[in-house]
Amino acid sequence: MKDKSIKVLEFNKIQEILKNYTCTKAAKDIIEDLKPYDSMYEVREHLEETKEAFKLLITKGAPPFEGVYDIRSGISLAEKGSALLPGQLLKIAAVLRCARRFKEYINHKEEEESYRVLENICEGIFSLPKIEEEIFNAIEGEDEIADRASSTLYNIRRSLKEKNYSVRDKINSLVRSYSSYLQENIYTVRGDRYVLPVKAEHKGAVPGLVHDQSSTGATLFIEPMSLVNLNNEIKELMLKEKAEIERILTVLSAKINANITGVKTDANIVWELDFIFAKAKFASEYNCTCPTINDEGIVDIIEGRHPLIDRREVVPISVKLGEEFTSLMITGPNTGGKTVTLKTVGLIHLMAMSGLMIPARENSVISYFNNVFADIGDEQSIEQSLSTFSSHMKNIVEIMDKADENSLVLFDELGAGTDPTEGAALAISILENLRKRGTKIIATTHYSELKAYALRKEGVENASVEFDVETLRPTYRLLIGIPGKSNAFEISKRLGLPDYIIDFARENISNENIRFEELIQNLQEKSIKAQEDARLAENLKLERDKEKKKYEEKLEGLQKVRDNALIDARREAKNIIKEAKEEADKILKDIRQLERMGYSSDARRKLEEERKKLKDKLDSIEEKEIKTVHKGEALKNVKEGDEVLLASINQKVIVLSKPDNKGDVLVQAGIMKITANIKDLRAAKGSNSNNSSSKIKKSKKLNLNLRRVESSVDLRGMDAEEAIYTVDKYLDEAYLGGLGEVTIVHGKGTGVLRKTIMDMLKGHSHVKKYRLGEYGEGGTGVTVVELK
């Protein structure tokens, strides 16, 4: 495919729009390299993946792309064996989670529609939940490791917390002792060591090590000698903490390295899915459909719209090519939409051949072409000193060298820019040469000679863009089969040019040309009328199909009601039979036990007789239960407002009309109005379901949730709505499980999720109080909740 044609048809602008629907830089890079595929098989497969993603968006909503990142730099470092930063590990885990969730998102029940192409793509996902879980368990945020990352880290931080408490107690005591020598009665920290702000003139009064001074020199920050050992211990613990964190990051990075193939594969699949769903989102936004693809040169675009024109203003066009004719000559006034038609056809083909759904109606047909050539617009080059004609001819020469039967060629104003007679002759020669090769052609022109060429040459068809002489405006509608009529005289007259000048001009045109223009006008009027009639017929057909579908759905609903009623009756009868038989068998078992103990067998024989009678009676219950649907007092007449039983569905209905001469009446069953015959109506005596159900005692069983409840819940990656639901459910379980204190992990981020959770906790019935985590607990990335 020629890059020049892709540029002229503005496919690059479609790529830029597509990028707006992606989540990752990697998917944007895929779109940047997007071009028409090299085979019809590839085109069909990529269109199918777009179509499947489009259906998933409709049926299942947004795909699970929350928190997906471009992790190529992190993968590269892990591949080299480097230790990754906490943020890099978190992003890798997020991508792994997305891949795993996508397999769940795309899964479908046996009776549901499958998604062949997307399922094949997702089959390649490794799913590494263990690594994903370890990373999320160990890392709280971009720069914070969780206490639970290792027992060693937990112990270090616990010791660190205890030492900090000790040193704070000690230094608070020193503040009180040295208060007269201090600038303020506080302590502070310099270089991870606790110090006192001592007035410079009293430095000798506080023995210790000077760590810093204020900008004015009036204050010295002195570490009292009695704190040196405690501060040293804190410093040692902090160094141990740092070393343990580095060890944890190294271990996690090594696990990524050991599974680098799976990580890379999952990441690449996620980015590919990001690209595919960007295509689907574009299709949804621009009301696109999936065309039928062929390699026979057949084109049938139904109400195609140029995607770069404002959707409120664009006028749909319908274009056919390749069956009855292989060349289409479009004529009409300037700014009438001829060039837009060419660009629409060309761009729609590039989109379809790149796996994109197209902005056209259902059942549109696109042909796979090896090449799409476009000579459109004035590309005159000042640097090359080329005229408009020369510039176009340079393009045409290149097209003539490469075009074949598998090419689509788009010419704008072919032969323009030179003497009209020579230009028209040259244009006809070029078109005829390409036509004989089997090339599919759409060309715009002003030349009458090309209109005549299309009329007399088999396989070539005229078309025109409609022009409203009354308003002096183009309608932008394309009329196939009708050459464009010159409107110069009509336009000039409406703009005020004197009649005598127009009449004199008419006298200088041959009678043959006048008759030709009149014939064109007559054909154009008839074509417009025929198209209007066709549109009206299509609308009537759509309306009829809509009504038919509505009544078919009503009929199906009634059938379901009837079937469900019969099923319920059978189920109820079976339950009665089952319970009665079980009771009888239990009594017989007891009698046999009595016999073994020496009691008379008379009771057993009598009970056997009763049991047989009961069995005979119960065996007919199911049939009787179902037959009751059709029994009841027959009705000879009904009136409006009567409540009766509709036997066919065993449901009470309200009579809405008197019987007609056929005995049909209109009745209301629930929210539906249906027609029934009076023979199918019975006198309503009350609900059978209530009576039967009252005879059956149903046992209830209390299910206790005895599973272990975790002491924390992780909300990272969730949106606000999902997080609120998860926390509410978790607090119920924790409360019932007898937990006194729990931790909610929401991460630091922008703080929106944290605020949402805190707002929810304020009025929660199980919450006694809550606070943000302290150092070592997760800081502002967690909320600690005390339960009632």
From Swiss-Prot:
Q: Where is the Smr domain?
A: 713-788
Source domain of life is Bacteria
Gene Ontology molecular function terms on file = ATP binding; ATP hydrolysis activity; ATP-dependent DNA damage sensor activity; endonuclease activity; mismatched DNA binding; ribosomal large subunit binding; rRNA binding
State its Enzyme Commission number(s).
3.1.-.-, 3.6.4.-
**Record GO biological process:** mismatch repair; negative regulation of DNA recombination; rescue of stalled ribosome
- List residues binding ATP: G332, P333, N334, T335, G336, G337, K338, T339
Q: Which UniProt keywords apply?
A: ATP-binding, DNA-binding, Endonuclease, Hydrolase, Nuclease, Nucleotide-binding, RNA-binding, rRNA-binding
Binding partners and assembly? Homodimer. Binds to stalled ribosomes, contacting rRNA.
Q: What does this protein do?
A: Endonuclease that is involved in the suppression of homologous recombination and thus may have a key role in the control of bacterial genetic diversity.
Protein family? Belongs to the DNA mismatch repair MutS family. MutS2 subfamily.
**NCBIfam families in alphabetical order:** mutS2 (TIGR01069)
Name the chain's protein: Endonuclease MutS2
- What species is given as this protein's source? Clostridium botulinum (strain ATCC 19397 / Type A)
